[in-house]
Amino acid sequence: MAKVCQVTGKKPMVGNNVSHAKNKTKRRFLPNLQNRRFWVESENRWISLRLTNAGLRVIDKNGIDAVLSDLRTRGEI
């Protein structure tokens, strides 16, 4: 399963671990993904989404129906 937020599209980033001696080794910064179920009143069913905490805040701000319609236009669901 890809580590991508379904709402915001956030993906892992690549960076460096930097030691005290300034030695650099590659690492990945992973998004804070959560699996959440949302009850959709208009469809009378549960929707499961894999999203970041930023995606949860977008749903809190805009509502689940607006986010789902946006996902459907993008072809995510």
UniProtKB/Swiss-Prot annotation:
It holds the Pfam family Ribosomal_L28. Keywords: Ribonucleoprotein, Ribosomal protein. Disulfide bonds: none annotated. The keyword Ribonucleoprotein applies. GO terms for biological process: translation. GO terms for molecular function: structural constituent of ribosome. GO terms for cellular component: cytosolic large ribosomal subunit. PANTHER family: 39S RIBOSOMAL PROTEIN L28, MITOCHONDRIAL, LARGE RIBOSOMAL SUBUNIT PROTEIN BL28M. Belongs to the bacterial ribosomal protein bL28 family. This is Large ribosomal subunit protein bL28. It comes from Polynucleobacter necessarius subsp. necessarius (strain STIR1). The lineage of its organism: Bacteria, Pseudomonadati, Pseudomonadota, Betaproteobacteria, Burkholderiales. The gene is rpmB.
